[in-house]
Amino acid sequence: MSQSYNNIDGLLLLDKPFGITSFDAVYKIKKVLNVEKTGHCGTLDPASTGLLLVLMGKATKLQAKFMKKDKVYLSSFLLGMVTDSGDLDGKVISENSVLNINIEKIKKMVEMFEGEIFQIPPMYSALKYNGKKLCELARQGIEVERKPRKVTIKKFEVLSYDGDIVKVRIECSSGTYIRTLAQDLGNVLKCGATVKTLRREKIDIFDIKDALRFKDTDSADKIIKKLIPL
């Protein structure tokens, strides 16, 4: 009979790997610890990696609080391509030349996205419309009108530009869609853009460098040692 950790209340910093859902990552921990209450703060798509805050026990009551915290992402955008999902998992809509694009032009254009901006949420998202997730409607070929949402981009740093790949670091408010930011940057550059890679590095004061590697979640002891009491 497996040991139960239902009396555990705390926060775990987890480094979610590529290819699994945030739900499955949390479920793995729930199963290993045999803990009843678990949750996470901010979904990462299967193709995205990085920091996932996993809450256990009474700490799950703090989910809404942590969901509102600022985040930092490291991402690479593929210029010259537009997809229906805003990332490489989607259907290619158009491909365009990037011959007239250089890093100086990119750096100048990202300045217009710093501060408070409005974003139209992507169809491929977990937001709901009349009770149905937008991503479910998108898979059926249905597109509905979405209201713009105000978000804050505190820092939009261009790290490098090589060929058609621009690497960026973004510090932003909760609710920011990096895929939408990539698409909007592609629009002002007049070449289109889509997210190639996305990694979440920070949520508020919590940093990916302090996170538990997913391969270590097989061990209840390693999970417990990384748990932050709340």
From Swiss-Prot:
Enzyme Commission number(s) from the entry: 5.4.99.25
Enzyme kind, highest EC tier: isomerase
Keywords tagged on the record: Isomerase, tRNA processing
InterPro entries: PsdUridine_synth_cat_dom_sf, PsdUridine_synth_N, tRNA_psdUridine_synth_TruB, TruB_C
UniProt GO MF annotations: RNA binding; tRNA pseudouridine(55) synthase activity
Catalytic center residues: 45
GO biological process, one term: mRNA pseudouridine synthesis
Residues of the signal peptide: none
Pfam families: TruB_C_2, TruB_N
Catalysed reactions, as listed in the record: uridine(55) in tRNA = pseudouridine(55) in tRNA
Known function: Responsible for synthesis of pseudouridine from uracil-55 in the psi GC loop of transfer RNAs.
Entry's family note: Belongs to the pseudouridine synthase TruB family. Type 1 subfamily.
Protein name per the record: tRNA pseudouridine synthase B
Lineage: Bacteria, Pseudomonadati, Elusimicrobiota, Endomicrobiia, Endomicrobiales
